[in-house]
């Protein structure tokens, strides 16, 4: 499995019994599965009392690493030997490997359904709209307020024939960067089709 260095480091830290005891590891692993599989899950999955003693930044890093590995394992439909090999490479002991495998088996079907619902192709942008975001002035002189833009991309999902919208907010520089990248992508596609 090819994971980024950041994810690998976070995942290897989960193997350290000094950082995460067995109970904490199990709670974090269940929280990772819950945040992936439960649409209503939010940051409250990490609010368990036994996880309060861990620095929130460290906790979120390990949680993200575990969730990324779970998704990658599900995407590749990893079997027990594949999981064990990778976990051993990350210095997991046999107890943690068994805990991971048990949790993975319990959630495997739901994970495969989730991954299957995502689709196999990227959404196609069909339209874009933008507007200036409203700014409220305050009496704070130390902050400089710059215009922000609300951008809405209308997309078409060819797998599900749905037409969802993707909305985000950005500042002037980010908007210019987005427009530049879209122009570059358009030129690259034109060149590719002319070959």
Curated annotation (Swiss-Prot):
InterPro entries assigned to the protein according to its UniProt record, in alphabetical order: COMM, COMMD3
Keywords: Cytoplasm, Ion transport, Nucleus, Sodium, Sodium transport, Transcription, Transcription regulation, Transport, Ubl conjugation pathway
Domain COMM: 124-193
Localization (cell): Cytoplasm; Nucleus
Cellular component GO terms, alphabetical: cytoplasm; nucleus
PROSITE patterns according to UniProt: COMM
BP-aspect Gene Ontology terms: sodium ion transport
Major localization class: cytoplasm
Domain of life: Eukaryota
Function: Scaffold protein in the commander complex that is essential for endosomal recycling of transmembrane cargos; the commander complex is composed of the CCC subcomplex and the retriever subcomplex. May modulate activity of cullin-RING E3 ubiquitin ligase (CRL) complexes. May down-regulate activation of NF-kappa-B. Modulates Na(+) transport in epithelial cells by regulation of apical cell surface expression of amiloride-sensitive sodium channel (ENaC) subunits.
Subunit architecture: Component of the commander complex consisting of the CCC subcomplex and the retriever subcomplex. Component of the CCC (COMMD/CCDC22/CCDC93) subcomplex consisting of COMMD1, COMMD2, COMMD3, COMMD4, COMMD5, COMMD6, COMMD7, COMMD8, COMMD9, COMMD10, CCDC22 and CCDC93; within the complex forms a heterodimer with COMMD2. Interacts with NFKB1/p105. Interacts with CCDC22, CCDC93, SCNN1B, CUL3, CUL4A, CUL4B, CUL5.
Protein family according to the UniProt entry: Belongs to the COMM domain-containing protein 3 family.
UniProt-listed PANTHER family: COMM DOMAIN-CONTAINING PROTEIN 3
Name used for this protein in its record: COMM domain-containing protein 3
């Amino acid at each position: 499995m090819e994971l980024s260095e950041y994810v690998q480091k976070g995942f290897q830290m989960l193997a350290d019994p000094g950082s995460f005891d067995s109970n904490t590891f199990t709670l974090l692993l269940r929280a990772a599965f819950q945040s992936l599989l439960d649409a209503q899950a939010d940051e409250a999955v990490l609010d368990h009392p036994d996880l309060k003693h861990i620095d929130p930044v460290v906790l979120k890093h390990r949680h993200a690493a575990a969730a990324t590995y779970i998704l990658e394992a599900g995407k590749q439909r990893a079997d027990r030997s594949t999981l064990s090999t990778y976990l051993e490479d990350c210095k997991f002991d046999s107890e943690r490997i068994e805990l991971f495998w048990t949790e993975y088996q319990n959630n495997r079907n739901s994970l495969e359904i989730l991954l299957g619902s995502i689709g196999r192709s990227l959404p196609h942008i069909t339209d874009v709209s933008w507007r200036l975001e409203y700014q409220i002035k305050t009496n704070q002189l130390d902050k400089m307020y710059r215009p922000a833009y609300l951008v809405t991309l209308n997309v078409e999902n060819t797998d599900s024939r749905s037409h969802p919208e993707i909305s985000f907010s950005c500042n002037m520089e980010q908007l210019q960067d987005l427009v530049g990248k879209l122009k570059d992508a358009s030129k690259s596609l034109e060149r590719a089709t002319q070959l």
